[in-house]
Amino acid sequence: MNKDQTLSHTTGRVSFKELQQIIKMGLVQGNLIPAFAGAWLAIVMTNHSFLSSIPQILLMLVGSTLIMGGACALNNYYDQDIDRIMPSKQSRPTVNDRISDRNLLMLSFGMMLIGEACLFLLNIPSGVLGLIGIVGYVSYYSIWSKRHTTWNTVVGSFPGAVPPLIGWVAIDGSLSLAAVALFLVVFCWQPIHFYALAIKRSDEYALANIPMLPSVKGFKRTRVSMFIWLVLLLPLPFLLSNLGVTFVVIATLLNLGWLALGFTTFRKESNQTKWATQMFVYSLNYLVVFFALVVVVSLIKMI
């Protein structure tokens, strides 16, 4: 594409659908679930009034959405070179020149600044955790680890697990064991989720020279890593034992179900894409069900 063609593309307005791609709205929405659960659990466990906490919850959700969307937009800016190589990324506005670099950076930093302002309005810990999430995702994951080490997914899991901490401190102002437990659940969940996706796109990552674990170490090694993270999930519901035996039992069954699904096709080497797809779909359902369970059980306790 020549310069004139590029200008003609970037001077048009970006559609709402394209904006969603730029800020990775699906990823943002997924992270808002544990953020809300963290806030809700803080209300229940620290005896805050729900009605008086609604403004904090809303401001936390707005701030979290903005900082995550802004960080994702900056990630898209930095990843333009590799996204142009990967077939699954060809519809991104950053790849087909639907948005200029200048506008993309303005959008990214504008969202992050406003988002951080919202979080700091809540309290200092919320703003600081937001900054940790931004720096961790943009610097340590996007710029450094993603292109240099097979540990990139684990590195990215740390900032990716910050939302429930922000949710909690937005209400209570300080962390607790329950907040850390939610953080650990998201932290351990992410490698399983993203390794499953990486198995499905292993050839693409290899083509773009991104050292994802399946592309570098192969399917067997990746699958073993996924099982390790699944095992690490098993004791985490017990850290939330204050929610009661029912919660611990259901959450443990949810973990065991995922482990059982993983073992069903463990030996079928030729079926690796189907296996990865099943694990990926379960991971999506797991995130929603686990945190919905946190909210529902704590609501029952509050009533």
From Swiss-Prot:
It comes from Staphylococcus epidermidis (strain ATCC 35984 / DSM 28319 / BCRC 17069 / CCUG 31568 / BM 3577 / RP62A). This is Protoheme IX farnesyltransferase. It is an enzyme of class 2 (transferase). It comes from the Bacteria. InterPro entries: Protohaem_IX_farnesylTrfase (IPR006369), UbiA_prenyltransferase (IPR000537), UbiA_sf (IPR044878). GO terms for molecular function: protoheme IX farnesyltransferase activity. Belongs to the UbiA prenyltransferase family. Protoheme IX farnesyltransferase subfamily. The chain crosses the membrane at residues 25-45, 54-74, 118-138, 166-186, 230-250, 280-300. One of its GO terms (biological process) is heme O biosynthetic process.
